[in-house]
């Protein structure tokens, strides 16, 4: 009977220790998925939104509206999302169709500067993606409901530098 009690205690302690570790692995996985979706969407939008007239002069001038449109379209398809609203061309709110994530907010900032050496223009796009992390394991969901209501945000920031080289 004593061995049975010790085995039960070890099993309980093992599950208490393992569940947060599983949640950390899930958090890393979600961060990788979000990062990959942002990078892929940005690459898709960059190629299609550069203005042709500026490309002839080796200037990387981006049509911001087209970039945002292509980016949001590719991001929606890659993460299985639907667009809730767009605040101008710089801020988008997406809602997941499969209830896998919480609402995702994407902010795009465009900066167009000269490169300082020649007369070329370089465009920098800063993308910030933010969502509240949704716990996957049952124990962590219970801890979240009993907790201090502190939100655990999952934030991904990427910078895309667009330049044209001769």
Feature-to-residue mapping (PLM):
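Alpha-helical assembly-interface signal, strongest on the long, hydrophobic N-terminal helix that forms
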Residues: 1-69
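Short, conserved structural patches
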Residues: 48-166
